[in-house]
């Protein structure tokens, strides 16, 4: 049986490739957007920011998605 309440928090993962492209191409052309994933994590087990390698349809490749503050 579960002990107490669940302390998992919602986490947003943002594509680091899209963010870098948006900063570098600010004047040249507008990017399609920034892709984000929603997931959960237990802050007691993983206090450091979460980074996962996921697919980004805007970059059309697998990139590192890092945790952002909401």
Swiss-Prot record:
Signal peptide residue numbers: none
GO molecular-function terms, A-Z: structural constituent of ribosome
Alphabetized UniProt keyword annotations: Chloroplast, Plastid, Ribonucleoprotein, Ribosomal protein
Domain of life of the organism encoding this protein: Eukaryota
Chief site of localization: plastid
GO cellular component: chloroplast; ribonucleoprotein complex; ribosome
Intracellular or extracellular location(s): Plastid, Chloroplast
HAMAP family: Ribosomal_bL33
Family classification: Belongs to the bacterial ribosomal protein bL33 family.
Name by which UniProt lists this protein: Large ribosomal subunit protein bL33c
Organism per entry: Pelargonium hortorum (Common geranium)
Organism classification: Eukaryota, Viridiplantae, Streptophyta, Embryophyta, Tracheophyta
Gene name of the encoded protein: rpl33
């Amino acid at each position: 049986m579960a002990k107490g309440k669940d302390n998992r928090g919602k986490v947003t993962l943002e594509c680091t490739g899209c963010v870098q492209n948006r900063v570098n191409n600010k004047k040249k052309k507008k990017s399609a957007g920034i892709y984000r994933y929603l997931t959960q994590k237990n802050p007691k087990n993983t206090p450091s920011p979460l980074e996962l390698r996921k697919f980004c349809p805007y970059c059309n490749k697998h990139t590192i998605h890092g945790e952002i503050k909401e």
